[in-house]
Amino acid sequence: NFFFMILLSDNQKLIDYLIKHRDEIVDISVPYKRTDTRPFFNANTLLALSGDWQLLKERALTFLNDEKKARSDLKRIPDHEFYVALADKNIKGMQEALDKLLELKLAKRAAKGTLLHFDFYLQPQVLMYAKIAAIHGFDLGIDSPIAPKELIDINPLVEYKIPYDFMKSFDFDAPHQVWVNYVKQRMEEAKQKKVENKKGFWASLFGR
């Protein structure tokens, strides 16, 4: 989940990017659909980050009030209880919702399959939601072995170095689709180069 990575980085430029380009990254008009909830859930996360309280609460209640939720989505109930409390600026409600996700059994179930490199020792949902709360000025006082305070507190680096040259040309003010198209183009170029290298290998092997 790249939302998690960006939020935990405390990189304000990237966080602002998610907020500014929210409507390009997710479709906030996507309705709740039991058979495919991922787009609905992703949109809710960015609504929470951008502070669109009324719409966030309406959508969260739509999910919570559905008596026929998919069994696989029952683990997302605390997430949406958190959203309602966040929209209401209810610190106790936020704490109670995230406390449920810190209970070992539910913590494991909620984290499973979300973050391959972290979900076996961190609770990603709690970290992400507590970070969103912190961004909006709410200290929930959470400090757990699977959701340590050090990762929730906002502590940006003095400098964020860009590790790859191809990323240095990206304009964070450009539409999100520009970046998507750029990455697709690079992937196609890499694929074509691989095909050409393969042809060159066989040509050299058989003298053609």
Q: Model regions: which residues?
A:
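Eukaryote-skewed repeat-based solenoidal scaffolds used as protein-protein interaction platforms
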Residues: 1-105
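Terminal, non-catalytic domain-edge segments
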Residues: 72-83, 88-91, 96-205
